[in-house]
Amino acid sequence: DIIKIGGKWETSFKFIWERFVIWLNNLFSKKNLFTVSIANTGFNITETSQFKEADIIHLHWINQGLLSISGIKEIFSSGKPIVWTMHDMWECTSICHHAYSCDAFKTICRNCPMLRFPHSKDLSYHVFKKKETLFRNVPINIVSVSKWLAGLAKSSTLIKDKHIEVIPNTLSLDDFTIFDKQESRQTLNLPKEKFIILFG
């Protein structure tokens, strides 16, 4: 079942509030405004009947006002088994979804290159300390969608001591059929000699 949590205005406010706090901490710069998340606001799902009735909790992408660090702590405190599937690096870094060439998450996030004015006690440092407390002594299972991402998770100070497994994203060949490339190009009226990248 899919349940809707929060109304349109509440959902929008939580999203905007998180972006506002990032913008404020970034001294009114839009730089990387949507490439970082701080999980400072979100919904409390532990009070829903679906959460209470669940045998296991499986988290996926929880950012941009969906769950806060304190809300995740409530989930962890429930005593229910937790599986968290990583779709980016946010679980193993402080605030970024992709660290690029930065490897601070292997020790401690600070002086964040995603911020306009990085320094030793910047926003990344404060969120890292909160996440460090959040993940301490919590027996969660981390699922990575790739070996590459699992390798990064295993090198992260935050979650390297967690059970980490790789379960790749898959496509059902019953739903997605592979057709001949040339025939598809002709049917879709696509150029036959051009290199084409499609995504959705």
Q: Model features per residue range: what roles?
A:
Residues I56, P81, I140, K194-F195:
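Alpha/beta-hydrolase fold active-site loops
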Residues S70-G79, K130-L134:
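Catalytic-core regions built around general acid/base machinery
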Residues I2-W9, F15-I16, G71, S94-A99, ...:
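Short aromatic-enriched loop/helix-cap "lid" or pocket-rim segments at secondary-structure transitions
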Residues D1-K4, K52, S77-P81, K162:
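N-terminal subdomain of nucleotide-sugar transferases
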Residues V143, P191-G200:
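Conserved donor-binding/catalytic core segment of Leloir-type glycosyltransferases
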Residues D1-I56:
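A conserved catalytic-core segment of Leloir-type glycosyltransferases
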Residues E91, A104-K181, T187-L190:
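Donor nucleotide-sugar binding/catalytic pocket of nucleotide-sugar-dependent glycosyltransferases
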Residues T46-L66, P81-H87:
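Short N-terminal targeting/anchoring amphipathic segment
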